[in-house]
Amino acid sequence: MDLFQSPGGDLIQDEDSVEVIEMLCIDFRDRLLVALSTTCQSDFREAKKVVEERLRDILETASSLSSTEVTSSPNASPLYNTDAPEDVVPTVGLDVGLDEPMADYSQNTPSITGGTASAEYQNSGDTNQMTLEDPACVDMFAAESQNTGHIPDSCLRDWSFEGVSMKSPSLFDWSSRNSNFPLTQEHENQFAEFLTLFEGEPNFDNWLSTMTWSSLESHSSPINGHSAGATPQLDQMHTVSNSRVARSVVSESTVTNTGSANSLNSGLLANTPSSSHSSVFERACSSVQEPTPEPTPVRGLQRKLRKQGPRQTTEATPCDQQIGPRASRATSQLPERRSMKMVRKEARDTPLTTSPANSTQINIEANTIPSDLSVEYAFGCFSDAKEVFETFYKRLSDDRKHLSSLLMRLFYAVGSPDALRQLRDALDLSRKNSMIASYHDSNDLAATVSVLDQLDATTTLSHILRRYHLVRLLDHRSKLESNHKAAKLAVKGTKRRLKYDCERIELMRRGENADCDANTRSAKERLKYRSKTRALTDLMQTLYPDLSPDSEGITTAGGCEYTRKLTKLRNRLACARNWYQFEETFPGAILALIPCATGDLSISIDHVEKLPSDVLKIFLDYLKERRGVFLSKMSRILSKDLYDVLMRRNVTKRYKLEQTNENSLTDGLHDDDRLLELCETV
């Protein structure tokens, strides 16, 4: 490699060197800015501005040199002459623009000292020449030799680069530590594995304050670097197409965080492994991936590395609060420790996955079962409550699955000891002279509690009697509907013939205008009365003979009253529908064996009465399948005289459950034969 120096301006006599210098300066600028971006210093913006200004001066100086000035520089003399003695070295007068010279890095690093250039580089030929165009770049190259401008032989005689041409394909980049130190494919792999010797990012505190690279002594032991989570965005960095920054050299065991990954891919760590790490460095070379043939952008690489599982970071700390150096650990344990951190990070980020068989069950428990005491009571008392719930959940449609918990509670509430306890209180109240609690002038605590107990019994008794009477009301309506259906079927043939004859007579009378008149008749004139509607009308006429509906367009007081009564009658018939289904499925006294809202399972009358018909059918089918035999026996035993006792028509009959202690009923087992014995009369 032939280098020349002019006595006046230290110009270079190769036009291609201008492009080389520009590439090196831009590469140095980008590497330096990326190094700044990996730190979390508060004065990052100020340091960035200073570096940009100094680098801009270098670029302007390099770009201002034209080919004419380069070739016409007089008295060009060699900057480096192999015949010159080693102690005579010309100095460079132009300073680089950085305030401090670059410090020495290590003993193993080729430094710019005295010596002669190796023959391989001197005789590389005209096509492989690499010359410098400006003393500023010479000064940057020779910073370690205190701006002597002397190109050392040790820098170019390294054993790893013997026989390598300057424009060889294997020589694809410059080292980030020393721009005069070539970096081959083999060294790129070794440099990536070398970064694994450091835990976290390097500490750039002293470097930012002096704008120089830190020396080897400051990195003798790993320093707890800053968090990579607060990396500033390099939106103002200028991208150059011919720049080879961010060479992708990714290793599975080394890519652990964003900060170290940026340093790895950009080659920014200005330290050489010491001799104590050389064995580890050589052993780890075999596990490093080959470098990517094309450069990867810094931002795209950062996003890629974050997807691979970056290490969790913390907020950046000020310079005066940073953690000091800590003792270095065994380097062989670093890949294992980092892999464990990545595993923990992936475990925190990865959502729990379950098999398809268990996913439905989890959704049922999380979204369907309400966290109320009645459900907890059912799951705590009954071992098969889970099975019952899942059965209802599977049989119900998607829009009715939220009723599974209610059906599960109702399944155990029918004919339960709690239902018998409430029935005992209702029977006791029905045998008294007055169902209304007696009035007390004094505000006595015992009397107040006694009245409340009596009112609860009154509520239970009223609920049971209401069920009976609702079923009777619906039964009346059903009988009227059946009568209308039978009458309609009886006169169907005669009515059809009569209708046909009347229509023919009407057509003959009206002639041509008959079809037009038939089409203009309103729908109300041709209103068809269904059997249910006519049965409801008959009920209203029987119950309220003095009321009649209003005519069209006329509103009267009697008509409004009729409408209110009709609405109330329809609501009662709707409430009686489900109780009627219970009575048909378990004939007898099943209506008295369903507890009220005061029970442990919290079954209110609204819960049962507002269940859809299809849902109630599913419930009754499963209830009859599982507990049908027991409930049918209990309903038949109580049905003989229960209604008469509740209505106080015959209070002489007594049941065994009335003579049983309340605790005995509460502690009773479900579907136990002893409960059937309590339903018998004395």
From Swiss-Prot:
Region (Disordered): 63-86, 107-129, 251-358
Regions of compositional bias (Basic and acidic residues) in chain numbering: 335-349
Biased composition (Low complexity): 63-73
Ranges of Polar residues composition bias in the record: 257-279, 310-320
Record note on biotechnological use: Pneumocandin B0 is the starting molecule for the first semisynthetic echinocandin antifungal drug, caspofungin acetate. Pneumocandin B0 is a minor fermentation product, and its industrial production was achieved by a combination of extensive mutation and medium optimization. Inactivation of three of gloP/GLP450-1, gloO/GLP450-2, and gloM/GLOXY1 generates 13 different pneumocandin analogs that lack one, two, three, or four hydroxyl groups on 4R,5R-dihydroxy-ornithine and 3S,4S-dihydroxy-homotyrosine of the parent hexapeptide.
Coiled coil: none
Cysteine disulfide links: none
UniProt function note: Part of the gene cluster that mediates the biosynthesis of pneumocandins, lipohexapeptides of the echinocandin family that prevent fungal cell wall formation by non-competitive inhibition of beta-1,3-glucan synthase. The 10,12-dimethylmyristoyl side chain is synthesized by the reducing polyketide synthase gloL/GLPKS4. The thioesterase gloN/GLHYD exclusively interacts with gloL/GLPKS4 to maintain turnover of the polyketide side chain.
Record-given protein name: Pneumocandin biosynthesis cluster protein B
Primary gene name: gloB
